[in-house]
Amino acid sequence: MKPAILLLVFALWASPGQGATPEELLSAYAALAGQSDPHFAGFSADRGRAFYFSGYRVEDGSELSCASCHHEDPRREQFAHHDKIPCRACHGMPDNGNFEDIPKIRRQFLPLAPSANSRRFTDEWFVEKWFRKNCGLLLKRDCTPLEKGDVITWLLTLK
C-alpha cells in the first residue's frame, strides 16, 4: 500500500493524541481495506471474534491469542504477571531465556471493549501503537486494516 494513502486517510487526525471515535477509526480502516482489496464488502464481527481468540505460535513454540493478555471477556480487566499470562506474552523471549531478569509488576490491562472502557479506540496514535506491538508479537507482521476493523467491529458489539 502506498504511504501517501495511509497519510491521507489519517489526515483527519493530524496530531498524536487527538480525539477520535471508534467509528471514525473504522471509516479510516475501511478506506485502507478498500485500497488493498477492491472486493472489500465491510467488516465482520464474526471474523473479529475469531481473530481475537485464534492462537498463534510465538518464539518458544507456545500458543498465545489476544485473549491471553486481554482476557477471555474483553469487558473485564486483567492483571499481568499471574499464572494465566506467561511472561513471554508481553515481553517475548528474553535474549538469555531467563525471565527472572524481568521485573514483576502487576500491570493492569484495562477492558478492551468500548462498552466497558469508553476511552478505547479514541486515540488513533495509541491504537496504532498497540496494534503494531501486539500484531508484531503474535503474527510477526502488521495486522491488516481488515483485521483491525474486524476486531474493533466485534468489540463494539459487546455490551
Model-identified regions with their sequence ranges:
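C-terminal capping alpha-helices of c-type cytochrome domains
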Residues: 125-159
